[in-house]
């Protein structure tokens, strides 16, 4: 009977995740049209911030308990998943006939690169995460949000839809459905795995690691179906930006100092794959199964390297 309840919970979570992601992307497009902003800006702000909420809660909670290791590990792991797993899903989910160079605002990728560089280089030089770093990152991310919203505008040719009523309400509710659905999927998947005797180490490095990226993955599939890869890359850059500039800053300011784990390798991987995502966003975007599967294999190899 217990397995039936868990499977029902898993199924409900999956439905909420998929339907919520569809509506979230649709609402993001409508919000972009209403405020005459490129879709990539909404992807970087509204969706990027929303899908970083789980990391914010988890890392802040860990920092409040004095566990900066867990908070930083969560951020680094999430950014690697965004730059490998989410990009892989995009290249696999795009329609076969889609091929175009996307119009992407340059603020979010440039500042993601800057904040990532500051974050990584500070640790490499000082071997710690000082309070000042957290304060600087927080100030920078606030400035970036202001720049993105105040300086970008959309061309008339991009105004393809009509404004719909209650788009903010729809967007907010769909985001909540996506986040709650992903949590239901992860919680029930973990419970099912434990029921069958799967170790906590395997569960943590697979189900939970991938589960934290489910909102981004679901949103990517929806955006790909709508032929909106600009939203996907906007979400990747925005999510990575918020993970470091907001989530990381908050965790560091709450619990600054050294961490006991050695994360130089993970930081290098995060830095490297973040710039790969920027490079790919500047080229013609089309369905590429080879690249998609290559990125998935790379992500799996990264997970195995953590053992």
Annotated model-derived regions:
Residues 1-307:
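Hydrophobic alpha-helical segments, chiefly the membrane-spanning helices
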